[in-house]
Amino acid sequence: MRKIGIIGGTFDPPHYGHLLIANEVYHALDLEEVWFLPNQIPPHKQGRNITSIERRLHMLELATEAEEHFSICLEELSRKGPSYTYDTMLQLTKKYPDVQFHFIIGGDMVEYLPKWYNIEALLNLVTFVGVARPGYTLHTPYQITTVEIPEFAVSSSLLRERYKEKKTCKYLLPEKVQVYIERNGLYES
C-alpha cells in the first residue's frame, strides 16, 4: 500500500512553514509523496477575503516545483461551496484504493478536530498527523500520529500583514512566490 501525505490549506500565500512541515513529515513517516491540497472555500474561513484560486494555485506551483516528492492535488477545486475534508477524502479514497492517506494538520487544527464535519467517519479514511505549532497543544480525544518539526513561526496571515505594512518577507517564503506577489501587487491593502 502506498503512503501519501496530504497538507490542505488556502496557501494564501504558501510559505516555507508549509514546505518545512511537508518535508519533515515526508521523511519522518517515510511517505512516497506529499500532496498539497488547496481549498476552494474552507468552512472555517467562509466570508473572509481570499485571493483567487488561480493566483493561489500559481503561487503553490512556484513554491513546490523544485521538490519531486511534492505534488498538487486539485480535488477540491472542482466543487462549489465549502471544502469539507470528509467529502474530499471520501472521493480520494475511492479514486486511490491502494493509498493510505496521512492528513497533516497543525496544532491549531488538532485542537479544532472535535468540530470537524463528520469527524468520526473521516477518522476511518485517514491517519491524522499533528505537527506542533507555537501556542497550540497536540491534545485531542482522537488518535493521531505526531511529528516533531523545527519551530518556524510564520503563517500566511502574518505574511499578508507584513506585505500590507510594506515590511520585508525575504527568507519567509520562496523567492519565486515573493516575486509573483510583488509583481501582482497582492496583499497591499
From Swiss-Prot:
InterPro entries: Cyt_trans-like (IPR004821), NadD/NMNAT (IPR005248), Rossmann-like_a/b/a_fold (IPR014729)
Record field: transmembrane: none
Reaction catalysed by this enzyme: nicotinate beta-D-ribonucleotide + ATP + H(+) = deamido-NAD(+) + diphosphate
Leading EC class: transferase
One Pfam family named in its UniProt record: CTP_transf_like
Keyword Cytoplasm among UniProt keywords: no
Pathway: Cofactor biosynthesis; NAD(+) biosynthesis; deamido-NAD(+) from nicotinate D-ribonucleotide: step 1/1
GO molecular function, one term: nicotinate-nucleotide adenylyltransferase activity
Domain of life of the source: Bacteria
GO terms (BP aspect): NAD biosynthetic process
EC number: 2.7.7.18
Keywords: ATP-binding, NAD, Nucleotide-binding, Nucleotidyltransferase, Pyridine nucleotide biosynthesis, Transferase
PANTHER family recorded: NICOTINATE-NUCLEOTIDE ADENYLYLTRANSFERASE-RELATED, PHOSPHOPANTETHEINE ADENYLYLTRANSFERASE
Entry's family note: Belongs to the NadD family.
Entry function: Catalyzes the reversible adenylation of nicotinate mononucleotide (NaMN) to nicotinic acid adenine dinucleotide (NaAD).
NCBIfam families according to UniProt: cyt_tran_rel (TIGR00125), nicotinate (nicotinamide) nucleotide adenylyltransferase (TIGR00482), PRK00071.1-3 (NF000840), PRK00071.1-4 (NF000841)
Name under which the protein is recorded: Probable nicotinate-nucleotide adenylyltransferase
Taxonomic classification: Bacteria, Bacillati, Bacillota, Bacilli, Bacillales
